[in-house]
Amino acid sequence: MTLEEQITHYRKQAGLSQEKMAEKIGVSRQAITKWENGTGTPDIANLMAIANLFQISVDELLSNEKSEKKQSNYIYESRTEYDIDGKKNFDIKLGGAYAVDLKAYHGEKIEVAMFSNVYKNLLADYKVKIDDIKNRIDIDLNRFNEASEADAKESLVITIFIPVKYIGKIELSVNAGTLNITDIENEHIEVNGKISEVTLQGNKSEIEIDSNLDMQISVLSHEGALEINQLSATSRLTLPADYRFRSTKKGIATHIYYERQGKKVDDFSDADADNYIEFNGIKSELVIVEAEV
């Protein structure tokens, strides 16, 4: 449950009306309403008052939001948070990284978490800059002290958490070995850069991937469009066995092939399916693979 759901749950469990709860912790009924519908967030003093009223810890009250952002097993880490007050488009520029996770979660803040088992000076060598410009948030990762992109590709792991209710369009630029995009529902996600492996799970979006490396793309679950743009590359796209999709190719000298149980087969796309795969580019090949059950 989200924080607002937790507050509602414990209030009802205690048999309290919003007005009665407000009296007990010394706030207005309107404050309780805002906390429960997600238009407001209690500060730390009020979180403590709520926890005390319901005889639970603040950690228990926040347990769901914390569980979505699991603790890392890395030696070094750095986290940057920023409060968001409404729906935003995101322009994210990361440069090089070993792995990047882009996730939606139930919370109020955007968080950029960096991990490494190598960088002792992670806090000094990498700085996250977040600019809030009207309806857009720019996130830039800057390197200092001669930290190189080559080093980042060897050992820097980045996880970006974006609040579910504030996600607009996303543009991500990154050069990474692996990229995971999870649980994002929005109009459009555009990915640019050099990426070797991509995993998509639980998304509802039009996802566009522009990369000229040979890629391994795994779709565990996805609703919407997937557009792949490549130049002189050969990539593989693995889909669940029961995944219905229609497909098309555009560009110059592009080809789509199909594979099942390790063998090339005829086109098994479905012209009536809602999910859509588009392959575009120049002198490139895409092999669509049906995952083995």
Predicted regions and their residues:
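DNA major-groove recognition helix of helix-turn-helix/homeodomain DNA-binding modules
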Residues: 45-60
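Conserved hydrophobic/aromatic packing and binding residues within compact polymer-binding modules
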Residues: 7, 21-22, 32-35, 61
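Short, surface-exposed interaction patches in beta-rich subdomains
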Residues: 142, 200-293
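Recognition helix of helix-turn-helix/homeodomain-like DNA-binding domains
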Residues: 27-41, 64-66
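Short basic helix-loop element that most often maps to the first helix and adjoining turn
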Residues: 5-24
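Short acidic/polar N-terminal linker immediately downstream of export determinants
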Residues: 13-14, 63-121, 150-154, 261-272
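Right-handed parallel beta-helix
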Residues: 81-85, 89, 121-204, 216, ...
